[in-house]
Structures are given as structure tokens and as C-alpha cells.
Design a protein with these regions (language model features):
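Rossmann-fold NAD(P)-dependent oxidoreductase module
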Residues: 1-2, 6, 73, 126
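Adenosine-cofactor binding site in Rossmann-like domains, unifying the SAM/SAH pocket
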Residues: 4-30
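SDR active-site strand-loop-helix element
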Residues: 14, 39-45, 82-88, 141-143
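NAD(P)H-binding glycine-rich loop region in Rossmannoid oxidoreductase-like domains
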Residues: 24-64, 76
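Conserved Rossmann-fold NAD(P)-dependent oxidoreductase catalytic core, especially the SDR/UDP-sugar
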Residues: 68-113, 139
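NAD(P)-dependent short-chain dehydrogenase/reductase
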Residues: 94-103, 128-191
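Active-site helix of classical SDR
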Residues: 115, 119-122
Length: 192
């Protein structure tokens, strides 16, 4: 969206209802038709602690399906450049702070979002493996937690910060004296 806003001329996007990224045949047809110079893979099934913990199978299956479909279809369509957005949750639960890239796979993952994290780690490895085998330029970026316009503020499905904002707004609106926040207050979050 930002690239379109900046008036880039050849930016192709599709909504979830326009193109199911889990469907490799449709993704390959789409990429073969538009022949992009690069693909930015930011799509994922995401959610907060409650969603990650109760929809574990959906999170790992859908994310692996999206990643495998888009990355492999990009290769088949001749796309040499791809950016894959990973997640900060790929790092160990008890990782030293601030988190460094070398801490990846150095400890246990947070159990509540382990299926999502494992899918993201698999996507990183898939990009690295395709780079080696097929001489591609597939890069993996690990953004910190982002929030803002079009975020999901649902108290069950959203990530920590949007949920916190909603709780504070609701507390002010309904004149509540306190808000309830899950956890023990020790986890650190990086936000943009």
C-alpha cells in the first residue's frame, strides 16, 4: 500500500479474497502472468496469544501453505528477488535482550505461538535453501511488532499492543478504574 501511495507504477497487490495464497496453482498463474521483478511476502495468518494457542493447527498449516506456495511459485515464475517477512517470535522465549540474529534456534520457543514461529523459521530456511540451490536473492526480514491503521483490535485475536490500546480506550470510554493485562509483566516488546 505504501509503494502505491508513493506512486510506484508497477505495484501489484491482491487481497485475501482475490487470491488465496495457499493455492499454489493460482499463485503460480498470477505470478507467471504479471512477471514481477520482486515479490514481498508479508501475508500470514496472525493473531494474539488466545488465537495462537487455540488455533495451533490452522496457524502452522496456513502459514506453511502460504509461504511454500508463494516462495516456490516465485521460483517457478522466474522471480529472482523476494523479501520474506518473518516474525520476532522466532527467537527463544528467554532470549537475551536486545534480541540479536545469532540467537535464532538457541533455545525453546514460546509455547503459545510455537506453531506460528516454526512455520516462520521454515520459511526462512526455505528462502536460504532456494538461494543456495537456485542462485536466487530471497531475503528474510524480521520486523519488530507493528501496530497502526488497519490493525486488528479484537481483544481475543489481536496482538499485545493493539489489545492494550483497546483496553485503555474502553476503560476511558466506560470510566473503568482498572484494566486486566495477561501475564506477569516481565516480557519485553519492540514496537513500531
Amino acid at each position: 500500500r505504501k509503494l502505491e501511495e508513493l506512486k510506484y507504477k508497477k505495484v501489484f497487490t491482491r487481497s485475501k479474497k482475490d487470491l488465496d495464497l495457499r493455492d499454489q496453482k493460482k499463485v503460480l498463474k498470477y505470478l507467471s502472468t504479471i512477471k514481477p521483478d520482486a515479490v514481498i511476502l508479508a501475508a500470514a495468518k496472525v493473531g494474539g496469544i488466545e488465537a495462537n494457542n487455540t488455533l495451533r493447527g490452522e496457524f502452522i498449516y496456513d502459514n506453511l501453505s502460504i509461504q511454500n506456495s508463494v516462495i516456490h511459485s516465485s521460483y517457478l515464475a522466474g522471480v529472482k528477488n523476494l523479501i520474506f517477512l518473518g516474525s520476532s517470535c522466532i527467537y527463544p522465549k528467554l532470549s537475551k535482550q536486545p534480541i540479536k540474529e545469532k540467537y535464532l534456534l538457541s533455545g525453546y520457543l514460546e509455547k503459545t505461538n510455537e506453531p506460528y514461529a516454526i512455520a516462520k523459521i521454515a520459511g526462512i530456511n526455505l528462502c536460504e535453501s532456494y538461494n543456495i540451490q537456485y542462485n536466487l536473492n530471497y531475503k528474510c526480514l524480521m520486523p519488530c511488532n507493528a501496530y497502526g491503521i488497519n490493525d486488528d483490535y479484537d481483544p481475543i485475536k489481536s496482538h499485545f499492543f493493539p489489545a492494550l490500546i483497546k483496553k485503555i480506550v474502553d476503560a476511558i470510554r466506560y470510566r473503568k478504574k482498572a484494566i486486566y493485562i495477561w501475564g506477569n509483566g516481565k516480557p519485553l516488546r519492540e514496537l513500531i
